[in-house]
């Protein structure tokens, strides 16, 4: 924890600097950041799992306590209003006592509806950041999630501090252990549900603590991009395994994908080719490179694989231009990663929030930024046999370029995706996922 504590001082200083700058521009007194409130299930007395406001957890790793507030102005010591009710029904969060607490003036709130007593008196000139706009209105905030403030903060959140980078390394390190356990479970005959349990046990996190719902897909289920069904029975014939799963550390996410073949076969060779292509794409990352250009380069590599593995005929550029590669690789190459899995700022051209949309032919690309030092992105090329997309090719002349026999042979395997988490440095790329032990 010493290294985190060392970096945390500079992290808080940077957050304060950002706040002071945007407050000066917008003539605001400060920001009041709400951790959030519990959400009650309809007609029930049970709450949905609580997820803290990412703007809140950017400052400190309080992840599971609703009704907390931060009062920051970039100059004074940030104030943390920490919720500790008198409650014999539920576990009450302990008063924080970690390395980060010295940077906050901590006040204890026992009743959520009494928070106004702790807030600034000139509340009308402070901006509320959070989800519960009705609460903000009752409290007297006239500025609620102002666009200028949000755009500025989102743009700069893509540049990670050293503290944030260390948290993300640790999130990767944890997830790698889960992936290794899941891989072993797959080769030992486990079902999707059982593989999930092996993964969660290895990372030491519950389904509500990992940053997103794990994708644990055997055989043809790997063709479903966001498959989360978890079959309890093992398939009669074990062919392939795609796992897309991450872990959390102090509110920061990892997001890693691997694909395995149960036996050495043509599909296994396709995985090897995709792995090689993914590493080549990562080698192309550097400051000044446009992320959409990397996405287009991915389509060229997918086109070459379609030709090499007798899935299609023609030439590389023609397969890309006709949209044939998009039927096999329909999603974007990757996205910003940080406090959120699909982190904010991926389309922001500047501090004002100027939006740079994805190319018209590639609407699902989640990042159009120019790469810069200390950004963290996923790199996740894929190739799938998705019948709904391939059937569209059959409707016109493009279907004549597809080798449907090869498609039929590969369909039971579902698809391939390989995803690493990469830090862009000034003079190199840091592939956290591989460097921390997930080499294949």
UniProtKB/Swiss-Prot annotation:
Binds 2 manganese ions per subunit. It comes from the Bacteria. It is an enzyme of class 3 (hydrolase). PROSITE patterns: PROLINE_PEPTIDASE. The keyword Protease applies. Its EC number is 3.4.13.9. GO terms for biological process: proteolysis. This is Xaa-Pro dipeptidase. It comes from Shewanella baltica (strain OS223). The lineage of its organism: Bacteria, Pseudomonadati, Pseudomonadota, Gammaproteobacteria, Alteromonadales.
